């Protein structure tokens, strides 16, 4: 049974990784893979509790999906009001090297509150108004990808993988930020410093202060755009605060935030005749935004997480964890390898697999284990979980296809895979390894 489940997962994974070759949507493959693995487990596993275990796995998966749908809706709502133009319209520098640093910093902090893909889309579209030279724009876009992935790794709501780890209790918001902010910053600073030498130190041609034309209707004034941007970002940042205050899971906080934003924008719609008179298809209302939610991505997450859940329920991941404990037994090596692997395959199933392989350890149980120092790495907010969060997020920058941000930039700017491998991958690797070194120093010197 177990070899068959593993074979199905590997074959499905190959089809997902080769989506651009097979031209079969990865969401369809993920759904089929999940159904096939659970079917094998049901027919050959002889587990009398399979119905209960299936419902448990579906419940865990749906918690993450509800959170993602809420976050995606709020971000799209901000964009529909032109809220992000408030940021892009204030970029006026003409020096290319200064511009690169400015964009990297904005991306780093923006992706901590928004998802990496949305942040990358906004910043790459901005580049088209700022940089005319195609190859120079590729360099800028590559730095944006690195900054987006690194920025998403230190925030509990910055990336799908951090959301997963945070919602399952593997990490807490405060400790995640305290442990990973500096390593993630270093992982951006080093590549950006090197990449800035690739661009000519002269003024950019035809730099436009009006950076991003999002198609936002003129009837939405700058004050309203700023108001929606502030309220939307505060609503997203409210989620970890809500969890800390109430003890309820993050998806409940996201539901509260989305409900508040929905009511607020409905009141604005009702009171502003100019918005009511807009063409119905472009009205900035949640009911319209929800129609544009990326459902294939949601279905992909369902398929992947349920497939990994089947491997966990069947004991496959436990066996893998036992093998790693016996043959590797070093958290930096394990997490570092996972990070490099995440540049080739999707980091969502990688992190989900690790969460299944290594359940959060109880402090007392870890202290009483045969190797307490190693076991302590797997308690809540332990060293392994912070390493995994960092490596899975930042490691996706090593290849252009290693992250959603990279794939988006590749599609928008037609960045060549070989060009990125030759010009950017070593830069990303230098930042990745430097960040791991910072985590090691934090652990050794101050015990973080």
Please identify what each model-predicted range represents.
Residues 6, 31-32, 65, 100-105, ...:
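Hydrophobic alpha-helical transmembrane segments
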């Amino acid at each position: 049974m177990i070899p068959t489940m593993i074979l199905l997962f590997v074959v499905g994974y190959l089809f997902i990784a080769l989506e651009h070759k097979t031209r079969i949507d990865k969401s369809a493959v993920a759904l089929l893979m999940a159904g096939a693995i659970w079917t094998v487990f049901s027919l050959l596993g002889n587990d009398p509790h399979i119905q209960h275990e299936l419902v448990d796995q579906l419940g865990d998966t749906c918690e993450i999906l509800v959170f993602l749908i809420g976050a995606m809706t709020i971000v799209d709502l901000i964009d529909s009001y032109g809220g992000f133009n408030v940021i892009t319209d204030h970029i006026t520098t003409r020096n290319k090297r200064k511009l690169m640093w400015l964009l990297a910093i904005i991306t780093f902090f923006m992706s901590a509150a928004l998802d990496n893909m949305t942040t990358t889309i906004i910043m790459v579209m901005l580049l088209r108004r700022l940089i005319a030279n195609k190859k120079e724009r590729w360099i800028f876009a590559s730095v944006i990808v690195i900054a987006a992935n690194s920025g998403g790794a230190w925030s509990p709501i910055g990336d799908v993988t951090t959301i997963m780890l945070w919602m399952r209790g593997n990490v807490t918001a405060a400790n995640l930020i305290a442990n990973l902010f500096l390593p993630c910053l270093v992982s951006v600073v080093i590549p950006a410093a090197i990449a800035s030498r690739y661009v000519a130190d002269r003024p950019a041609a035809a730099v436009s202060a009006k950076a991003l034309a999002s198609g936002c209707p003129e009837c939405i004034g700058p004050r309203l755009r700023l108001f929606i941007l502030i309220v939307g970002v505060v609503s997203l940042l409210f989620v970890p605060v809500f969890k800390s205050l109430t003890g309820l899971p993050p998806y409940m906080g996201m539901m509260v935030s989305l409900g508040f934003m929905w009511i607020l924008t409905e009141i604005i719609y009702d009171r502003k005749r100019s918005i009511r008179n807009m063409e119905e298809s472009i009205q900035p209302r949640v009911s319209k935004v929800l129609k544009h939610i990326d459902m294939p991505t949601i279905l992909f997450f369902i398929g992947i997480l349920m497939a990994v859940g089947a491997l966990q329920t069947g004991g496959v991941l436990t066996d893998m964890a036992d093998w790693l404990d016996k043959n590797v037994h070093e958290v930096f090596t394990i997490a570092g390898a996972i990070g490099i692997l995440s540049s080739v395959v999707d980091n969502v199933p990688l992190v989900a697999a690790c969460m299944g392989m290594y359940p959060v350890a109880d402090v007392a149980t870890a202290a009483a284990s045969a190797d307490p120092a190693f076991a302590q790495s797997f308690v809540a907010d332990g060293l392994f979980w912070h390493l995994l969060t960092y490596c899975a997020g930042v490691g996706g920058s090593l290849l252009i296809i290693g992250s959603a941000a990279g794939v988006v930039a590749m599609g928008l700017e037609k960045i060549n895979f070989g060009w990125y491998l030759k010009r950017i991958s070593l830069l990303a690797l230098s930042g990745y390894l430097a960040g791991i070194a910072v985590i090691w120093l934090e652990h050794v010197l101050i015990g973080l």
